Design a protein with these regions (language model features):
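Short, low-complexity N-terminal leaders and the immediately following helix N-cap/first helix
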Residues: 1-20
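Reductase modules of NAD(P)H-dependent flavoproteins
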Residues: 2-8, 159-281
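FAD-binding FR-type
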Residues: 11-13, 24-122, 278-281
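Active-site catalytic microenvironments for nucleophilic, acid-base chemistry
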Residues: 44, 139-143, 262, 266
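Short, flexible hinge/linker loops that cap or flank conserved catalytic cores
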Residues: 62, 114-117, 150-152, 239-241
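Conserved beta-strand elements of the Class I
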Residues: 121-124, 248
């Protein structure tokens, strides 16, 4: 532990299960923690004498200076996540007992929101890669509501690819912003939501977009029960240009590489027009 980056004690405030093996963890910190939307923090979990660190992108807005929210997928045989699903560990994290403790270090990362860029933003996430985008969206929405007269009009296209619809984390929150955009055409922060699933045979109730996150950029005439998202998908795919859009990518390395290759064919340049954050298990 360095003097520059000391660990901050944290207590588990809540654990909300979005789906089996997919949960939201909120930690209360003993002192303020400042960060930029898109950055990550390292969670240090100590249990029965063993300490394990693991970096996680921050979901919460920077305005919550003493709370950190993480969107975590249970990785079987993972270094840390299996412990977060054990009842004795959770109980210890809530009560801060002698055997169990959580600490935070950071923030770190350059995958951050660029408020100086006036272009519309496309957030492409696979799985829990949605986490940093939720921090960005929440922060932008707070600024939009606080000082609408000073807010630069912009549109955010949120593309989220998962295997099954039950894994579309934060879906109600994003859908609410998209619905408000539809009701208020003059809304300065306009949000479009494009969720897509890759295993529809095992999700028969789904009537939305199909395919992995990268498929959102493919041209298609395929209809889907009148779902307007197919029209939006086609419009986004055809209108996407580096002059008007900056694309942020987060999640599975394969998804990021595939989308990057497609965008480069359209004239997008890495770092300038494409921001990337790869997740590794």
């Amino acid at each position: 532990m360095s003097l520059r980056d000391p660990r901050i004690k944290a207590r588990l405030e809540s654990k909300y299960d979005m789906a089996e093996g997919l949960s939201v963890f909120r930690f209360t910190l003993e002192r303020e923690f400042r960060f930029i939307p898109g950055q990550y923090a390292t969670l240090w979990l100590t249990h029965k004498g063993k300490t394990t660190p693991r970096p996680y992108s921050i979901v919460s807005s920077p305005s919550e200076t003493r709370v950190l929210e993480f969107y975590i997928n249970l990785v079987e045989h993972g270094r840390l996540t299996p412990s977060l699903w054990e009842e004795d560990v959770l109980r210890g994290l809530r009560t801060a007992d002698q055997e169990t403790a959580a600490e935070i270090t950071g923030p770190k990362g350059r995958f951050v929101l660029d408020l100086e860029d006036p272009r519309d933003m496309v957030f492409v996430a696979s799985g829990t890669g949605l986490a940093p985008f939720m921090s960005m969206i929440r922060y932008l929405e707070e600024r939009h509501l606080a000082t609408p007269e000073l807010f630069h009009p912009r549109r955010i296209h949120v593309v989220h690819g998962v295997s099954y619809s039950r894994n579309l984390g934060y879906r109600p929150e994003i859908e609410a912003l998209a619905a408000d955009t539809f009701r208020n055409p003059r809304r300065k922060l306009a949000v479009t939501y494009l969720p897509t699933i890759s295993r529809p045979r095992l999700d028969p109730g789904w009537r939305g977009l199909l395919g992995r996150a990268e498929s959102i950029f493919e041209q298609t005439d395929r209809p889907c029960a009148g779902d307007p998202r197919w029209l939006v998908k086609g419009l986004l795919s055809s209108m996407l240009r580096p002059e008007t859009h900056v694309v942020y990518l987060c999640g599975h390395p394969g998804t990021i590489d595939n989308v990057t290759a497609t965008l480069k064919e359209r004239g997008f340049k890495p770092d300038l027009d494409i921001k990337r954050e790869k997740y590794y298990r």
